[in-house]
Amino acid sequence: MPKPTKGPRLGGSSSHQKALLANLATSLFEHGRIKTTEPKARALRPYAEKLITHAKKGALHNRREVLKKIRDKDVVHTLFAEIGPFFADREGGYTRIIKVEPRKGDNAPMAVIELVREKTVTSEADRARRVKASQAASQDAPSEPQAAEEPAAEEAVAATEAVAAPADAEATDAEAGSADADADEAPQN
C-alpha cells in the first residue's frame, strides 16, 4: 500500500512532488550535474540512486520500472547503457551534494547535485594490501632460521657505531673551533 512521504512536500501535493523529482532526475542523468535548491537536492539523492541501482541490474523489468518514473526514453537508454555499467562495481553513493552560495533573488539555500565520476580507490587499495600481506607472509617463513644470526650482526653494528661516535664528536668540535676563530677575525663595526 503506497504511503505518503513524511515531512513537507516539494511543490505542495504528492503528485507535484513525484513529477518534480522525475524531472530533476531526468536533468541529472542528462547533464551529469544540476544546480537546485538544497531541499530538492536532498530529496532527489535517494530517488536518483534507486534508479541507478535499477540500471545496474539491467534487466527488462528494471528498465520498465525506471520508465514508469522517467518518461524520456533517451535518458533511460543513457542510464542503462552508460551510467549503470559505470557504477557496476560501486555499492551506493552514486551522487554527491555540494552546497553553493544562496540564490540572489530570494536567498534560498542552493546546492549542486552531481554524479560521482571518479572511480573508488578502495578496490585498488584492497588489492595492494592483499599483495603486500602475501609478500610479507612469504618473507616471514624463510626468515625464521636467519633470526638467530641477526642479533649477532646488530651487536657488531652497534660496536662499530660506538667507536665511530667519539671520532665524529672530535670532528664536530674541531669545526666549531674553526668557526669561532673565523668569527674573531671578522671586523666589527
From Swiss-Prot:
Q: Where is this region: Disordered?
A: 126-189
- The highest taxon in the source lineage is Bacteria
Family classification: Belongs to the bacterial ribosomal protein bL17 family.
**Does S-adenosyl-L-methionine show up as a keyword for this record?**
no
* GO CC annotation terms, alphabetical: cytosolic large ribosomal subunit
Name the PANTHER family for this protein.
LARGE RIBOSOMAL SUBUNIT PROTEIN BL17M (PTHR14413:SF16), RIBOSOMAL PROTEIN L17 (PTHR14413)
What is this protein identified as? Large ribosomal subunit protein bL17
Here the segments flagged for biased composition (Low complexity) are 139-180
Name the UniProt key words of this record, in alphabetical order: Ribonucleoprotein, Ribosomal protein
The record, for Pfam families, names:
Ribosomal_L17
Q: What Gene3D superfamilies does this protein's entry cite? A: Ribosomal protein L17 (3.90.1030.10)
Q: Which GO biological process annotations does it have? A: translation
SUPFAM superfamilies membership: Prokaryotic ribosomal protein L17
One term of GO molecular function: structural constituent of ribosome
Q: Which gene encodes it?
A: rplQ
On subunit structure and binding partners, the annotation says: Part of the 50S ribosomal subunit. Contacts protein L32.
